């Protein structure tokens, strides 16, 4: 120890160490006691911490450790046995708690590690969700741009505006330096620059369609990046540019329109595409992003649809213009046809009036001659003249009827009539001819055939007369039979005609008329010709002539009455059967009671004269006036004539019982004249009967006469029998009027 140079401390070494141990144990105990307090505080603040009981163990362990260090302060000096026992107890408890805590950590540490793993997993999930949210936001942004671009593209149906709007909106949305659209030429061998973003009229730029870059783009439905030096991308100036921006190209399908053809579009027999090229700004680090490429692809599809709609609209407008031109041409043709029809009708009306006037003279004078004493040869000549005149008058009527049937102006005059009387009247008219030709004529009316019917009596009689007259015309010998029955449903099944569909009902019935003859027959190939105008067939002898207008008019009358007509013949020389079915209404009792007594009048007036009956005749045609006067004088009438309106108004008086007037008299309207006569004779029984004697057979004339208050209408020509019948009916009405 003599050679040791150690410095003696101020306090002894044992005391210094003890002091440090005192201080250390105190602070260790303080720390141990504060840590459980902090744990208790944070556990109370945390509502989701799952290991509360573990913290209790840690707290107990730490408190015991602190208590051990605190008790240890009294063990450095002399201490009692109690302190040693307390110290030992604390250390034992600390050992037990620390071992239990250590054992529990074996189970807790894996859970804590899994918590860390879950934390990392959640962080990864959060990062993935952030990426998905970013993608969703990008998609929403892309969708918004697509909707905006689609709205702009669909705002018009002009294809030039569509394409220009597409380039402008894409350039604005994607901040493009240039955007161009290359369209295929009509030959399909080249692409022509049609629209650009900055050039107004890009013309003269064409590239072959078989370039590799074009083939690559056309073979894919995606937007592809292409070289900025590609021929389809060489549109922007390169002066002062160091790095060209990225370029993408996408195909635009030109949809196939099989029913349309646009003049300046390529032939679309094969699948064709246009090419849209989009260029990013030069000298920038910007690159195409995925959502931008998707936007370009969607816009290309929308442009294709919009172009197809525009093409359809253009063709529709072109078709509309063509249709309007055709309508104008059709309207012009219709007006020309109507003008021609009016001219024809006017011509026929004039010819009708002018032909009936001389026919009136011929028939009237011939009928007067018939009632005089003539030699057989003279009577035969007069009868021949009268028959020929009646035939000519019938032909005139047929021509007018056919004209009105063809232009649709002829309508049925529906009324209640005696159906049996119609057939008896036909029999009476045809019988004289059959007697001359020595033909047997029979009539059979079905037991269920109603006596009265509703329909057009005149047209039905005309149809029957035409068919029967045709049978008489082509029969030199043998017989003719007429049968009329109510058509049954079984009969309808035998008739298979496309435009004839009879419908049974309680309000109407179908009349079936059949005329059989043993005449010259008809060749089967000639049957369809018989219903045409002035048909010439091999029917009968050559001097019999054609079928004229009779069957043609008859067919049209039958069609008007919702019926059907057909002919049957086994061949030449084997006769013929003509059958037609027409629709007639069923008459009720009230309509039957209102039927006129025409048949009675005709029966009682066959040889009646009218001595002393004062009649006034007004006609501007001297021949017609004289002929009418001759007929009336022959019937015993006292006749006064007038050749002008002034003369007529001057001589007409209450003494005149009947007035015959021609409504076509020049100087004043005949209808106006009738009104003036009605005004002149205030009392109805003082006014003479007013009868129109005219050559106009149209329906308008008849309706005008009824409106003007005329009492009758007679069509020229007029025979003596017809005049006698008219006067008898007028006198019968006057008697009925005076006795009522």
UniProtKB/Swiss-Prot annotation:
Its EC number is 2.7.13.3. Residues 158-307 form the GAF domain. It comes from the Eukaryota. One of its GO terms (cellular component) is endoplasmic reticulum membrane. Binds 1 copper ion per dimer. Its cofactor is Cu cation. One of its GO terms (molecular function) is ATP binding. Gene3D superfamilies: 1.10.287.130, 3.30.450.40, 3.40.50.2300, Histidine kinase-like ATPase, C-terminal domain. Signal peptide: none annotated. Its main location: endoplasmic reticulum. Residues 614-731 form the Response regulatory domain. Homodimer; disulfide-linked. This is Ethylene receptor 1. The lineage of its organism: Eukaryota, Viridiplantae, Streptophyta, Embryophyta, Tracheophyta. The gene is ETR1.
